[in-house]
């Protein structure tokens, strides 16, 4: 994105999101205790997944805009998804696809990823916290033996705590077989030796001013020490699960989703699960050019894992307590590029909510005939953030402190009232 275009977009976003509603509303308070945020890095094509339209054609010389896959019915009358979401179609009574999410001005992966995670444009003055860090800050962990926020994916500033500091940060892992790195003591450091090291370090840390980066580091270190050892690491042992259940979740991405359920049971408040761990332009859900040829495999992986997660949480009576979010940085237009792929689109795209004690309806909002813009119930991104916070029992209008400066959790976001009883 050119600098002039970005500045123009930033000004537009700051002025008003698409179809924003400025009337005061009552802030509902949901009952969800946990949030699993599934991240589809690269830009999921809503028209090929959760918002199917008429069939298009991307192989002929004269291409026809539309969906690549056939639409199928779901358990919610009148709500359809594409054929590669056949398992999710069977549990849609627990799901609401927000089909009219928009941020309108974003057309670049890094900026869009940041805005979907923080609800705000990048600022030169403020590092805004991510949605995971805000929930971790406001709700904390359910139990003292786990952190409030775990990221299954590579660390990134867009997922970070921003001005909230290290205490609202995440513990991350990239391998479901080993769990987070650095939380098990080396064999040569027994409990006595570890205690001696802590005692030697304590006087140095005590001298640090309370309001300093060192104090933040101290807080993070204390948490790390409290998590070290087998008590915390046992939550990452997927071998404790029945083989049939592990198989139901599918491959590595599915195992990450299974791990997220175990972390919910352990008391972790917010878990982000990355589908493709190390997203690079042109990979994963970034389906430019020939990228579309593997898109059906990505959708099938998502379908298998998402449906299994919903069923598993329901079986364990955790679904009403656990809000599942499926997010992506933007959607895709109905038109095809020269080699059959799709470009970027922020004017309308789909995000998914499941469980969490919400009043689900299969789909909310209606896009136009080719899913290019909203025609009913538009959901500006700031309202989507407000809906997630409200579902987690957090007031999205509450002010957090950046030093002495109050910053509201959302910029005037209003929860979608239809989802709350």
Model-inferred region functions:
Residues 1-421:
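Ligand-binding pockets and gating/stacking loops
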């Amino acid at each position: 994105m050119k600098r002039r275009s970005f500045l123009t977009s930033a000004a537009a976003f700051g002025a008003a999101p698409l179809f924003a509603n400025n009337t005061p509303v009552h802030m509902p308070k949901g009952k969800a205790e946990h949030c699993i945020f599934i991240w589809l890095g690269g830009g999921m094509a809503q028209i090929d997944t959760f918002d199917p339209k008429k069939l298009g054609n991307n192989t002929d010389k004269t291409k026809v805009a539309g969906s690549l896959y056939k639409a199928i019915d779901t358990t919610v009358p009148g709500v359809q998804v594409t054929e590669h979401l056949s398992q999710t179609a069977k549990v849609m009574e627990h799901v609401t696809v927000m089909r009219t999410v928009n941020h309108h001005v974003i057309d670049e992966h890094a900026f869009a990823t940041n805005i979907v995670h923080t609800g705000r444009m990048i600022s030169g003055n403020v590092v805004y916290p991510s949605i995971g860090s805000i929930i971790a800050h406001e709700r904390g962990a359910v139990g003292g033996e786990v952190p409030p926020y775990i990221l299954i994916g590579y660390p990134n500033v867009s997922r970070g705590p921003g001005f909230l500091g290290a205490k609202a940060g995440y513990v991350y892992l990239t391998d479901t077989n080993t769990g987070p790195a650095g939380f098990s003591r080396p064999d040569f450091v027994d409990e006595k030796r570890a205690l001696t090291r802590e005692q030697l370090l304590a006087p140095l840390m005590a001298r640090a001013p309370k309001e300093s980066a060192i104090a933040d580091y101290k807080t993070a270190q204390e948490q790390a020490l409290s998590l070290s050892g087998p008590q915390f690491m046992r939550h990452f042992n997927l071998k404790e699960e029945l083989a049939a259940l592990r198989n139901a979740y599918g491959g590595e991405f599915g195992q990450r989703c299974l791990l997220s359920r175990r972390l919910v049971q352990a008391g972790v408040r917010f878990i982000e699960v990355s589908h493709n761990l190390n997203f690079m332009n042109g990979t994963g859900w970034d389906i430019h050019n020939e990228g579309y040829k593997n898109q059906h495999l990505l959708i099938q992986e998502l379908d298998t894992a998402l449906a299994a997660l919903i069923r598993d949480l329901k079986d364990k009576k955790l679904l009403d307590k656990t809000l599942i979010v499926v997010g992506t940085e933007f959607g895709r237009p109905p038109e095809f590029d020269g080699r059959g792929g799709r470009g970027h689109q922020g004017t309308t795209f789909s995000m998914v909510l499941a469980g969490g004690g919400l009043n689900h309806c299969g789909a909310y909002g209606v896009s136009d005939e080719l899913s290019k813009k909203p025609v009913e119930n538009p959901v500006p991104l700031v309202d989507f953030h407000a809906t997630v916070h409200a579902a987690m029992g957090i007031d999205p209008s509450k002010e957090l402190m950046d030093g002495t400066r109050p910053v509201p959790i959302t910029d005037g976001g209003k929860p979608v009232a239809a989802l709350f009883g």
